Amino acid sequence: MTKNFYCLLLGGALLGSCTVQLAGVPNQTPAQVQATYRVTKDVAYGTDKEQTLDMYLSPTANRLKQKNYTIVFLHGGGYYVSDKAREERYIQPYLKKGMNVVNMNYRIKRGVPLATEDLTYALNFLRANNAAYHLDLNRVIVTGFSAGAHIASLVAVTANDPAYSPKLASGIKIAGVVNFSGPVDGLDVVEKVFMSNDVLVMKAIGVALFPETTDYAPKEYIRKYEPITYFDKNDPPFFIWQGGKDDQVPPVTFEKFVALLQQNPQKNEVLFVPEGQHSPSAAELATAYQAIFEFLDKKVK
């Protein structure tokens, strides 16, 4: 037997002997991740060419017992650029723990309203096809960076709103949200940040956020896409990472939402990094994931 295999056996024995705490699960090496995961790239969950996802299925995920979460990650890019392959650093910590991970694309350059639908479509696809994947869809953690984190947050807080469409299929429960720099309020502020930018691609992002309007979108329209509009005590636990020097999603846009989260510190976690930019550095990301696994251990049921 190889050394890697012995390590996996030892990890499995430890997991089987006690209540699992993700923070204490030994990290697999990159070689172990590559050797053990069943990876399927570019699975179509819709008819549009951008509606694809990557599946990372772990043969040892069931050993995580009550912490066998299904992680669904969405990339950033202002709903306009980027791709799931460009932000894999956000899923690596979960893979090292042996968790099942879905890394998804969504429709870009067509505005916030269309992009926000695709997470629901992807989750419903996973539910309809779960005989092939064997995911625990009663323990879904939706997560993302920037635009992707906004989408994750919006779907999480609207899941219990009977009037919101599209709807999640039965048999899906969002157990928690991990949001890196994603708008939760003040989308009008974010729109102005981008539309007033002298960099052409940044301005293009701002113009494309709400293509139904020709100028700045009215606040009453934007409010439909702000997670704070739907926030209530029945929403899943939130973990938010926020940079104090974020020049794309300004800290002021988080203030009201964070205040709501902090009313229940036993449930929610906010990691504010005063010197943090929009995108966390490698060191900031490592620190964040230490806190995220403790959040998943202690605050997510």
Model-identified regions with their sequence ranges:
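Mobile cap/lid helix-loop segments that gate and shape the active-site cleft of serine hydrolases
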Residues: 32, 48, 190-229
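Short beta-strand/loop motif that positions the catalytic acidic residue
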Residues: 234, 239-242, 246
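Alpha/beta-hydrolase active-site loop
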Residues: 110-132
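Catalytic histidine-centered segment of alpha/beta-hydrolase-like enzymes
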Residues: 276-286
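Short amphipathic alpha-helix adjacent to the substrate-entry channel of hydrolases
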Residues: 83-102
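N-terminal cap/lid segment of alpha/beta-hydrolase-fold proteins
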Residues: 22-64
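Conserved alpha/beta-hydrolase "acid-adjacent" motif
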Residues: 247-256
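Primarily recognizes the serine-hydrolase "nucleophile elbow" in alpha/beta-hydrolase
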Residues: 124, 128-194
